[in-house]
Amino acid sequence: MAMTPQLAFSRMPPGFRFQPTDEQLVVDYLQRRTAAQPCVTPDITDIDVYNVDPWQLPAMAMYGSDHDRYFFTMAAREAQARRTTPSGFWKPTGTKKTIFVVAGGHEVPTAVKRRFVFYLGHHQPSGSNNNNKTSWIMHEYRLMNSPRAAVPSSSSVNRLPTDDLTEEMVLCRISNKDLPKPPFIHNSLLQFSSVGLNGDGYNYLILDHLEPPAMEYPNVGIGNVDDAAAGTDDPGDLDEEIDDSMQRNHGG
């Protein structure tokens, strides 16, 4: 039987919530997924993220926390990547962040994280004022020197290739900060005896009951913001700092 979001939640302890750090996403999920090794929790959803409007994605996710949902997808190599959906496009904002993983006592650059904001409509020339910015955010994680991705054991995406060197497996975190948090029942830490590849245990699995919120098209949250400049003055950089601070507060 195919795994569905409802079935995935039903198999988790009451109050399960998924809240990994950037390093844990890279080491325990993206690296293991590209190596065809089992991940910590079953089935982060495989889907063509770039061909689906963001408000359709939350209902397709197996796991998430607060405003976040996680997906594996095949993406074109960075230079050829196109991120256009039926209703709009994902626009990069801020600066790329290198994710370091501790190996052999040294911090090794392992992946790159990049932030995108979803805009309704078609691409506009750089520097133009675009009033169709929404509240949908995507953080895209790519391995540096990415190996060829393996076919998932179960996937709704039939196009995932094994031998196309123009594409690579990436992990996407989709969120909408303007949407209300889902209802939580518990507020305690779920500890596991098994230890992750990074040696600190799976302490990012939190006991907080989560029901996927209804995220529909009217809630896209259009704003009047011009973020054409992509540098240290970009609002995305401040959001990155806030995002990193929140991860540290959760033990990342």
Swiss-Prot record:
This chain belongs to the protein called NAC domain-containing protein 23
Q: Which function does this protein serve? A: Transcription factor involved in the regulation of seed size. Binds to DNA-specific sequences of CLPD1 and OAT promoters in vitro.
The UniProt annotation puts the region (Disordered) at 225-252
What GO terms in the biological process aspect are recorded for it?
regulation of DNA-templated transcription; regulation of seed development
- Gene coding for it: NAC23
What is the organism field in this record? Oryza sativa subsp. japonica (Rice)
Q: Where in the cell is it found?
A: Nucleus; Cytoplasm
Keywords attached to this Swiss-Prot or TrEMBL record, sorted alphabetically, are: Cytoplasm, DNA-binding, Nucleus, Transcription, Transcription regulation
Task: Report one GO cellular component.
Answer: nucleus
The NAC domain covers which part of the protein? 12-177
Keyword Ribonucleoprotein appears in the UniProt entry: no
Question: For bias kind Acidic residues, which ranges apply?
Answer: 234-244
Q: What is known of its domains?
A: The NAC domain includes a DNA binding domain and a dimerization domain.
The principal location of this protein is nucleus
Tissues where the protein occurs: Expressed in stems and panicles. Expressed in developing endosperm.
> Has the keyword Transcription regulation been applied to this entry?
yes
